């Protein structure tokens, strides 16, 4: 067996062991759900890293993101030519300024309802596949697309309706992600395909960790997604 594979198996075992060791309620850990998440994450990682179609999809996504960054960088160069056309450019202008022009794209997609539909579809599928509560699954997908701060803002209505234990779960999950602007900055430092591959894998890892550290049983009548209409009726 490949030594690299053995090291990774040991790492996953240690990862699960430490999470179980610090669990708030070891008796309520849902091993079936965690096993499904581990299996799904393994298949996802293999698909994105090894499978040709998966690698092609990641490369296309990375190329698209890099094209957005380059286009935004052209705008920065037009506005701040004296700051950009230098031998040693500051990180503010080389990595962060272009992101300020890219992030509004997510706002536009949200405004027209495109991004919410994608998030809801993926969140619903993840919940059905793994057996995790609906909102936690939706929130994981929101983090993947929007980042922690934006996801919390979008989900503010739901946060007011769920109990403190589930809020703790979301707080833990929020520590595992970064905003789109930081991801964009990372793509300027290393190949974008590695960054974009790590994002969905990391989201599933976050679900695994919180399912063990803070296991919560959600009754069927509470396993819902809050909407403005349902809130007004309540």
Feature names for model-found ranges:
Residues 129-187:
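Alpha-helical membrane segments and immediately flanking helix-loop junctions
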Residues 1-92:
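N-terminal alpha-helical transmembrane segments of multi-pass membrane transport
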Residues 11-22, 37-49, 97-108, 177-185, ...:
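Hydrophobic core segments of alpha-helical transmembrane domains in multi-pass membrane transport
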Residues 17-26, 110-111, 152-157:
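C-terminal ends of transmembrane helices
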Residues 50-143, 234:
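Membrane-embedded alpha-helical segments and adjacent helix-loop junctions characteristic
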Residues 6-10, 31-49, 96, 118, 137-152, 196-201, ...:
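Hydrophobic alpha-helical transmembrane segments
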Residues 203-234:
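Long, contiguous bundles of hydrophobic transmembrane helices that form the permeation core
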């Amino acid at each position: 067996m490949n030594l690299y594979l053995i090291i990774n198996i040991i790492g996953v075992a240690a990862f699960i062991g430490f999470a179980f060791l610090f669990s708030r309620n070891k008796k309520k850990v849902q091993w079936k759900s965690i096993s499904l998440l581990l299996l799904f994450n393994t298949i996802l990682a293999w698909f994105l890293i090894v499978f040709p179609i998966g690698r092609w999809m990641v490369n296309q996504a990375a190329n698209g993101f890099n094209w957005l960054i380059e286009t935004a960088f052209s705008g920065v160069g037009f506005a701040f030519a004296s700051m950009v056309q230098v031998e040693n450019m500051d990180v503010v202008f080389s990595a962060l300024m272009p992101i300020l022009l890219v992030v509004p794209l997510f706002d536009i997609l949200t405004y027209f309802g495109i991004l919410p539909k994608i998030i809801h579809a993926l969140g619903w599928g993840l919940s059905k596949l793994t057996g995790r509560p609906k909102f936690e699954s939706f929130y994981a997908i929101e983090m993947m697309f929007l980042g922690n701060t934006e996801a919390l803002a979008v989900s503010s209505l739901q946060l007011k309706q769920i109990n403190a234990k589930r809020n703790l779960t979301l707080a833990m999950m929020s520590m595992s992600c970064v905003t789109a602007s930081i991801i964009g900055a990372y793509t300027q430092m290393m190949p974008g395909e590695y960054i974009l591959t790590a994002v969905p894998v990391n989201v599933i890892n976050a679900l695994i960790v919180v399912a063990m550290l803070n296991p919560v049983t959600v009754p069927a009548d509470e396993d819902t997604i809050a909407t403005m209409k349902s809130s007004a009726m309540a």
